[in-house]
Swiss-Prot record:
Belongs to the MSOX/MTOX family. MTOX subfamily. Its cofactor is FAD. Its EC number is 1.5.3.-. The gene is solA. Binds 1 FAD per subunit. It is an enzyme of class 1 (oxidoreductase). Coiled coil: none annotated. It comes from Salmonella agona (strain SL483). Monomer. This is N-methyl-L-tryptophan oxidase. GO terms for cellular component: cytosol. The lineage of its organism: Bacteria, Pseudomonadati, Pseudomonadota, Gammaproteobacteria, Enterobacterales. The keyword Lyase does not apply.
Amino acid sequence: MKYDLIIIGSGSVGAAAGYYATRAGLKVLMTDAHMPPHQQGSHHGDTRLIRHAYGEGEKYVPLVLRAQTLWDELSTHNEEPIFVRSGVVNLGPADSAFLANVARSAQQWQLNVERLDATALMTRWPEIRVPDNYIGLFEADSGFLRSELAITTWLRLAREAGCAQLFNSPVSHIHHDDNGVTIETSEGSYHASKALISAGTWVKALVPELPVQPVRKVFAWFKADGRYSTKNRFPAFTGEMPNGDQYYGFPAENDELKIGKHNGGQLIQAPEERKPFAAVASDGAEAFPFLRNVLPGIGGCLHGAACTYDNSPDEDFIIDTLPGHENTLVITGLSGHGFKFAPVLGEIAADFALGKTPSFDLTPFRLSRFSQ
């Protein structure tokens, strides 16, 4: 059997692509080296932020707004919502370049973002402490996503729509010819007109020339109480320290507040190098500088987890066809800020398989930028 689209890697982007392409009427085969959702990629740990006024650059805003529409639609397929509109407050020094980008994105796209000085911040959320020179940019319409629930939902919907799924079966080779793409797996060979490579951190095992660097990251849950929950209107947050370190976190659930550090981490070259949480001496203390200064009421570390970022050289996404192979789309280099975009990236992949022109300007995400 020849498929219209084979998906290599069915985590966040691959799961979304499998659903949207199958829903569009294509014959799709989803593959994964493991059984998604799983612990080997970048999507586990229950929750991920979604921000609209994007500090990483205005080029992402149209993508994230489309993603939000798709998240809202996906949430209708579950009793438990996938998107929780908790609001997100972005904290940092008033002269922060990241916050300047947030403000610029909000202004250009007329987004609902409120600027709060330090006094107003601490009045609204007495649990938060910041220096006098800090501000907060509060996005009331943003919030967080239930990442593993999202992937489970896409996989179920794709399967119900007739998508073939081959999991726990790593792809060992990809072959291109005039008739399309052939993959080799432990279960045999499969052929399609087009392929999506969304293999995440270890994409270089299949495409060695891609400029992607795996980075071991950790996040952890700390003892909290009801003051830090959505019931008390406590928001999700990003926070920049005076030294430039970037943190992110979520409202407490079951008296546990999850937080992680966006920058830093350990460069790794193989999956076995991603040691479990607490294997690196600094893991449990990584969030202390932020918690001590900004959330001093939070208690000790309860447990944590390790994940992996697939960093591109400029930490912007890679969305492009492989050089010399226009029938193969690669989406990688999401650099630790990609999950919120998963549905729109999946939709872009489905449009690629359908032969449609992308609805977005993807020029900033082309591979050619690294050779200029």
